[in-house]
Amino acid sequence: MNICNSLILKAMPAIALAIPLLWQTPALAATCTSGSTCVTVNGNGDSVLDKEAARQSKEQWNETKNLRTKVNKRAEKEFDKFDKAIDARDTCMKSTNINAYWEPNTERCLDSNTGMPIRP
């Protein structure tokens, strides 16, 4: 038993040095040399498929950005229209002209006698 333990203790440093070398053997064998042909599969992530996917993603982003811009412009236009109608209603209601009244369906300030639009 004592002999077995001494052999293990003597062999342990050699085994500790040999294991990393065995680990590196496949890596050293796989390196490309100047006279050999090397094929790298997805080596740096710059493949044609990746470029195409990036192009399609950018194209989709640009299309959705254009649609968002159109939607935002339309919403802003509707808001401005609504805001102008509120301002026009307020000025019509505050008008000193006693014949002026606000028509909610047409959103205009009308003369109650003639029905014609007026500027209060």
Swiss-Prot record:
InterPro entries: DUF1283
Domain of life the protein comes from: Bacteria
Signal peptide: 1-29
Keyword presence, Transmembrane: no
Keywords annotated in UniProt: Signal
UniProt xrefs under NCBIfam families: PRK13659.1
Family: Belongs to the UPF0482 family.
Name the UniProt record assigns to this protein: UPF0482 protein plu2232
Source organism of this protein record: Photorhabdus laumondii subsp. laumondii (strain DSM 15139 / CIP 105565 / TT01)
Lineage: Bacteria, Pseudomonadati, Pseudomonadota, Gammaproteobacteria, Enterobacterales
